[in-house]
Amino acid sequence: MVRVSVLNDALKSMFNAEKRGKRQVMIRPSSKVVIKFLMVMQKHGYIGEFEYVDDHRSGKIVVELNGRLNKCGVISPRFDVGVKEIEPWTARLLPSRQFGYIVLTTSAGIMDHEEARRKNVGGKVLGFFY
């Protein structure tokens, strides 16, 4: 399999395991961006606990799934988004205003669109989940 994006492969394997009804999934290779993305998903309750396993190569992550994930994906290329431009992106990517999150990488770290709006920072769109 050709690896286009580590984050894309991680989210696709999670989404496929969720559709199959699996309780956990192993993601490899691992990266800091994948771990931060999973932290945002865990904070909002879309996944359970996850554990990083160091195999002295690229690392693995074992994620506990809880059945709440409907869809997740990566936006490529990573478009620049200002604070005022977050709203059109939420309308385009998410099914409704109260449902789902867009994950941004900002100068203040990787966070969801609501936290970025509260902190008044823009950044690049990494992906979304709902």
Curated annotation (Swiss-Prot):
This protein's UniProt keywords: Cytoplasm, Ribonucleoprotein, Ribosomal protein
This protein's GO CC annotations: cytoplasm; ribonucleoprotein complex; ribosome
Gene Ontology molecular function: structural constituent of ribosome
Domain of life of the native organism: Eukaryota
InterPro entries: Ribosomal_uS8 (IPR000630), Ribosomal_uS8_CS (IPR047863), Ribosomal_uS8_sf (IPR035987)
Listed transmembrane segments: none
Listed GO biological process terms: translation
Localization of this protein: Cytoplasm
Similarity section: Belongs to the universal ribosomal protein uS8 family.
Database matches in HAMAP family: Ribosomal_uS8_A
Protein name (Swiss-Prot/TrEMBL): Small ribosomal subunit protein uS8
